[in-house]
Amino acid sequence: MADRLTQLQTCLDQLVEQFNATVNYINTSSEPSLLDEDPTSVSNIAASAPLPANQTQQGSTLGSNRQTVSPSTQAEAESNFENTINELSTDIILKSRQISMLIDSLPGIGVSPESQLKIIDDLSKELQSVEQEQVKKIQEKDKLLKWCESLIVEVATGISETRH
């Protein structure tokens, strides 16, 4: 498993991809609307400005392929658009929460390098003691296994002697 910083970087990359996909979906699937309340504002005038020649040609090609949409189909399309936006928003929220959890798991700014080294040293000592305990348990298991084998041999020998 990757360390927390690598996980955090991966999650941030995924979040950027989700933002990009969401903005792209909105740009390609939504109906144009005013950017603010004032229709004479600079942003609305710029948004309603005519497209450059090459984009106009592409738009006319796309426009000629479009068919008239019935009101029920348009309502379904709007519902589908809203559902997709809700799903994309939920994905972004979940990824943001995952990033927050990863950030919370990182050592704080107030944690000095010395205290981090002390924590690592303590964990290393704890690991060594657990490994020693594991070795002892393995030796105990081997001892019990040999004892069980000797009991089985004694029982088998006793049974064979009683049959002769």
From Swiss-Prot:
The keyword Coiled coil applies. Its main location: nucleus. It is found in: Nucleus. Gene3D superfamilies: Mediator complex, subunit Med21. Residues 49-81 are annotated as: Disordered. One of its GO terms (cellular component) is mediator complex. It comes from the Eukaryota. SUPFAM superfamilies: Mediator hinge subcomplex-like. Keywords: Activator, Coiled coil, Nucleus, Transcription, Transcription regulation. Pfam families: Med21. GO terms for biological process: negative regulation of transcription by RNA polymerase II; positive regulation of transcription elongation by RNA polymerase II; positive regulation of transcription initiation by RNA polymerase II; RNA polymerase II preinitiation complex assembly. One of its GO terms (molecular function) is transcription coactivator activity. Residues 114-146 form a coiled coil. Component of the Mediator complex. This is Mediator of RNA polymerase II transcription subunit 21. It comes from Scheffersomyces stipitis (strain ATCC 58785 / CBS 6054 / NBRC 10063 / NRRL Y-11545). The gene is SRB7.
